[in-house]
Structures are given as structure tokens and as C-alpha cells.
């Protein structure tokens, strides 16, 4: 055997220094990721039980057992993640580790105690917002009062919820009845805005929010940037869209209660064809015709009304091993408007079901415009005559369909601008800000004495979230246009649609930045051109 050379010996011995410890093996990180996914799965199942008011999961597992398992995994996960040296990882592994550590700290705290307070009583809303200094505490207080109030509205002797009442405005032929029904929303407005004075809960909240965000990019701006819309373009684009609506619709002013009637003709004509008992079945059939088998995708629903249920429709993970999307909404009636919302929430569900990535990235970019945009991929079809004829056996003229589609979208854009302007100047009178926006762009007669802006829970529960709907409308118009150009029309059904869209838009979870996914699909940056083109299909005349 030939003796080793001196340099080789020196290298082998490391010049007398101890060898550096080896980096974590792929198996070590993979084991941590597997434990992470197990922990998230358990927390998802607990959260869904709490949202549904149940004590047992569909498979019979009790909440107590789920909490016990979750509590036993959390410290093990924390130890595993803390023991990984991120400096020894490759770029993607380091990013995955960072995602898991942030999620553990932010979203995987102790399981909340079960609610033993009951749901029969109204929250205490006789409080002075000026004595509440914590932003999150005030937000929770306002939202609790808003949630209860919007579900217990009296109109013409009947108790209804906010969405049912607003749907009725679009169907009532009697202007005076519409006015009465609209004003029946006043308790909702007061739950947010009080008497629009120094004691207004919202005005106190927006002052605290503005102080907290001073000198920083607003959440709405950051979310839009992540989707590919630069903040310096955002407000300008929204104004351009609102101006286009103003130009293609009649200039005569309408009362706010008549706005819903004007934009609701499609709902008036077609809602009778969607009774409550058909609502979920029709939703399933529409997606089945697009190649998305909701049963096979494990989509679950909680749609029945009950006291204490959140007033906001939402979709979430009900498990991640495998992914089980859960849709929560409340429907007392059927109708076109509720079908549109259910198709939207199911759009979220099929997004979740299509995620195919490593455990650390098995999530969605929640609360961003892209997420809201792709949820509307199919929901927007309900306003197209061809879709209506295919699924409802009747249709309305295109102009009525487009008014139905954009009536809600343009209100969302107005709310997004409203929130931006209130954050810039929290001392402004919110009633006046809203009155100017809606009269200048939507031809709605100004009523600064009415706080009718104060009926979106997102304004208090998730500041900046209305911008997701607004920016999302721009993004989905571009995505739908691009899909038709690359894949073909899907308005009457297309069994290959889901299989084509899922790997191009839905599968990534957190694997790729939203902007990269969107611009890759579009072949370039986002622009409002597709939405503006769609708006201009609308004639000015009103039947």
C-alpha cells in the first residue's frame, strides 16, 4: 500500500480541527414536514368542528380526542423544527423550514377551549369604543355585534338575515317596500358605526388601524403587489373601471334601495328556477360538468342556518391528510344570488382540492386577490345568457346579466376605495366618503345621513380584505380571457376544464409566489384590459 501524501493527510485530519457536523439529512427534514402536516391536519379538524358547532367529526372522532392528539404533536413539532439548522439547507428546503416555523408560531397555538357560553343570547353591544385601546379587541367586539345583528333583522314582521333582505330588494316591485326593507338594515349600520359620532365603533377602529399602519405599506397594497398589481396602479385602475361603469350606465340618479332592483333583474327572472332544495344539487352539477367531481374531491358543506354561526361565507381546510375542503355558508332561500355565492365558495374548495406540493407548502395564499379571483372562475358565468339557458332553461338579455355581474363587483371596488381613503384620513366622515364615491361613479343618490356602507363584515374583521375582491375581479377577468384563448369556451360545460386549469393555476399552494403563477399563466403582467372590455359590452339603456 502506498503511503498517503502529506497534503492528503492534512486534508483528512482537517489541520487538527474537529470536522463540522453534518447538515440535516433529507430524511430529517422530511420527517419534520410529515409531523407538520399531521399537526395542521388535526388543527384543521378541530377548527371545522368549532365552526360547525359539532362535538364529533364525521368519522366519529370526538373533539376532546382531536385536541389531545394535537396537544401531543405541537411540542414534538416545535422541537423538530428548532433542531434543524437552516444555514445547512438548500434554498427551497430553507424556505420550506421558514414557512413551517412561521405557521407554527402564528397559526398553531393552543387549541381554543370549547365554547360553553351557548349561542342563544345576543352579545353586549352597549359599550363605549373610546375605552377600548386594543385594536384586535375592538375589532372582535364590533364583529360580534355585527354578526348577531345582521342575522336578526325585522322587516314587515319577519326576521331575516342581511343577505336575504338584500336579495329581496332585487325582487320587490314596490319602491316603498324596497325603501322600508333597506332602512331595516339600520341596526346593522349602527352595530358598526353607532351614530356616526365620536362614539362610532368603526371610526375608533379606523383611527387605531391608521396609526398602526402609519409609515408602512397598507395590507391592501401589499396583497395587490403580490398578485402582480403595483400599488401605484391599483387605485388608478379602480377609478378607471368605476369611470367606465359610470359612462356605460344611465346618468339618472337612483336611490340606494333601487340600485339593488336595477341590478337585480336577472335574479328576479331566474331565481324561481333555483329553489332552496335545488341549490346545492345545481352547484354540484355545474362543477361535475366541468370535470370537478365534488364528492370525489371530498368537498363538505355546512349550509343550514343556526344561531351563533358566522355571518360570512367561507371555505377552509377540514383536513390535509388528505385535503378535505369545507364550505360554510347560510342559506334560508335559494335564488340566483345565493347560487352565485355557493359557486364562489365551491370555487375555493376545488382550488384547495387541487393542491399538489410538499407538506410545508400544502396551504393556499389565503387572503390575497388571486385566491378570491379564481374562486369566481365559474361563479361569474351565472350572468351569461348561454349559461343561464343551459342550466336554468331560461335567460335574460346580456345587458341585464352584466348589470347583475358588475353591480356587486363595482360595489366591492367602491368599498375598497372607501377603506383606502379612510385609512389615509381617519378623521373623515365615513358617510360622506361613501356618499361621494357611490354618487360620482355608480349614479346612486347621496344619503350622507345613512351609514349604508356599514354592512360588510370584512371592513372590521379583516382590514384591507375588500381590496382582494376588487383586485381579484381584475385578475379573474384576465384569467378567464386567457383560458378561452388557450383552452376554449367553458360556459356550457367542459369535462376537461378542471384537469386543464388545476395544474396551471391551483396546484402550487405556497410553492410559487402568486405573482409568478398569475403572470406565468397570463404570459405577462396583469392589466385591467379584459375587465374594461367586458364592461363595454353593456348598452346604456335600461329596459
Task: Please place each PLM-identified region on the residue numbering.
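Post-HExxH zinc-binding segment in Zn-dependent metallohydrolases
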Residues: 238-246, 365-401, 472
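Active-site recognition of the HExxH zinc-binding catalytic motif
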Residues: 337-353, 372-376
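N-terminal helix-rich structural modules
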Residues: 20-197, 464, 514, 528-529, ...
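C-terminal, non-catalytic "cap/extension" segments appended to globular domains
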Residues: 19, 24-31, 50-62, 79-83, ...
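Contiguous, non-catalytic segments that form substrate-binding/exosite surfaces or channel walls
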Residues: 185-336
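Active-site metal-coordination segments of metallo-dependent hydrolases
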Residues: 360-374, 407, 461-469
Amino acid at each position: 500500500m502506498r503511503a498517503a501524501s502529506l497534503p492528503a493527510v492534512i486534508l483528512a485530519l482537517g489541520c487538527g480541527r474537529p470536522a463540522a457536523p453534518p447538515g440535516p439529512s433529507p430524511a430529517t427534514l422530511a420527517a419534520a414536514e410529515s409531523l407538520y402536516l399531521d399537526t395542521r391536519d388535526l388543527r384543521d379538524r378541530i377548527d371545522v368542528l368549532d365552526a360547525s358547532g359539532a362535538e364529533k367529526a364525521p368519522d366519529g372522532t370526538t373533539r376532546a380526542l382531536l385536541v389531545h392528539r394535537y396537544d401531543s404533536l405541537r411540542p414534538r413539532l416545535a422541537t423538530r423544527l428548532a433542531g434543524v439548522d437552516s444555514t445547512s439547507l438548500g434554498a427551497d428546503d430553507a424556505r420550506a423550514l421558514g414557512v413551517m416555523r412561521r405557521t407554527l408560531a402564528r397559526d398553531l397555538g393552543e387549541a381554543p377551549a370549547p365554547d360553553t357560553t351557548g349561542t342563544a343570547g345576543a352579545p353586549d353591544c352597549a359599550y363605549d369604543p373610546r375605552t377600548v385601546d386594543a385594536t384586535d379587541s375592538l375589532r372582535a367586539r364590533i364583529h360580534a355585534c355585527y354578526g348577531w345583528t345582521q342575522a336578526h333583522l325585522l322587516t314587515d314582521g319577519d326576521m331575516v338575515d342581511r343577505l336575504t333582505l338584500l336579495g329581496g330588494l332585487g325582487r320587490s316591485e314596490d319602491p316603498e317596500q324596497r325603501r322600508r326593507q333597506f332602512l331595516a338594515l339600520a341596526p346593522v349600520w349602527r352595530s358598526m358605526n353607532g351614530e356616526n359620532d365620536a362614539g362610532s365603533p368603526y371610526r375608533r377602529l379606523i383611527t387605531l388601524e391608521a396609526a398602526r399602519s402609519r409609515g408602512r405599506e397598507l395590507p391592501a397594497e401589499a396583497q395587490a403587489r403580490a398578485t402582480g398589481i403595483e400599488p401605484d396602479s391599483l387605485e388608478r385602475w379602480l377609478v378607471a373601471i368605476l369611470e367606465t361603469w359610470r359612462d356605460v350606465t344611465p346618468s339618472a340618479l337612483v336611490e340606494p334601495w333601487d340600485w339593488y332592483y336595477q341590478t337585480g333583474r336577472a335574479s328576479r327572472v331566474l331565481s324561481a328556477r333555483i329553489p332552496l332544495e335545488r341549490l346545492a344539487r345545481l352547484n354540484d352539477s355545474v362543477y361535475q360538468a366541468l370535470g370537478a367531481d365534488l364528492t370525489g374531491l371530498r368537498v363538505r358543506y355546512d349550509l343550514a342556518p343556526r344561531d351563533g354561526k358566522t355571518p360570512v361565507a367561507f371555505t377552509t381546510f377540514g383536513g390535509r391528510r388528505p385535503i378535505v375542503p369545507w364550505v360554510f355558508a347560510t342559506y334560508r332561500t335559494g335564488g340566483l344570488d345565493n347560487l352565485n355565492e355557493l359557486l364562489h365558495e365551491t370555487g375555493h374548495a376545488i382550488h384547495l382540492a387541487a393542491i399538489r406540493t410538499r407538506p410545508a407548502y400544502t396551504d393556499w395564499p389565503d387572503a390575497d386577490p388571486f385566491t378570491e379571483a379564481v374562486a369566481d372562475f365559474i361563479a361569474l358565468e351565472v350572468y351569461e345568457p348561454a349559461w343561464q339557458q343551459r342550466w336554468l332553461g331560461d335567460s335574460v338579455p346580456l345587458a341585464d346579466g352584466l348589470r347583475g355581474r358588475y353591480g356587486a363587483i363595482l360595489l366591492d371596488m367602491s368599498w375598497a376605495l372607501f377603506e383606502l381613503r379612510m385609512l389615509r384620513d381617519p378623521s373623515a366622515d365615513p358617510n360622506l366618503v361613501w356618499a361621494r364615491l357611490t354618487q360620482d361613479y355608480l349614479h346612486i343618490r347621496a344619503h350622507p345621513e345613512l351609514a349604508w356602507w356599514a354592512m360588510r363584515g370584512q371592513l372590521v374583521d379583516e382590514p384591507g380584505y375588500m381590496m382582494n375582491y376588487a383586485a381579484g375581479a381584475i385578475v379573474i377577468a384576465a384569467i378567464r380571457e386567457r383560458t378561452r384563448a388557450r383552452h376554449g369556451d367553458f360556459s356550457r360545460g367542459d369535462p376537461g376544464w378542471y384537469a386543464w386549469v388545476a395544474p396551471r393555476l391551483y396546484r402550487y399552494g405556497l410553492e410559487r409566489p402568486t405573482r409568478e403563477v398569475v403572470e406565468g399563466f397570463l404570459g405577462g403582467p396583469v392589466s385591467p384590459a379584459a375587465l374594461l372590455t367586458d364592461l363595454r359590452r353593456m348598452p346604456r339603456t335600461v329596459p
